[in-house]
Amino acid sequence: MAKKSMVVKSSKKQKFPVREYTRCERCGRPHSVYRKFKLCRICFRELAYKGQIPGVRKASW
């Protein structure tokens, strides 16, 4: 889990757009966040396995 202070800090409007970065909306993790879903890889995997993300299914080939 991310520090609450860092989550609040990243949610504020930055003076320069370069300083903005994505965070997982579920846990607040700053790295490995999928922009389309706004989730980190760990939360994405959990929700995908549960079937809570529409249109996402496990790949098999």
Swiss-Prot record:
Binds 1 zinc ion per subunit. Zn(2+) binds at C24, C27, C40, C43. Disulfide bonds: none annotated. The keyword rRNA-binding applies. Pfam families: Ribosomal_S14. One of its GO terms (cellular component) is small ribosomal subunit. Part of the 30S ribosomal subunit. Contacts proteins S3 and S10. Binds 16S rRNA, required for the assembly of 30S particles and may also be responsible for determining the conformation of the 16S rRNA at the A site. This is Small ribosomal subunit protein uS14. It comes from Staphylococcus carnosus (strain TM300).
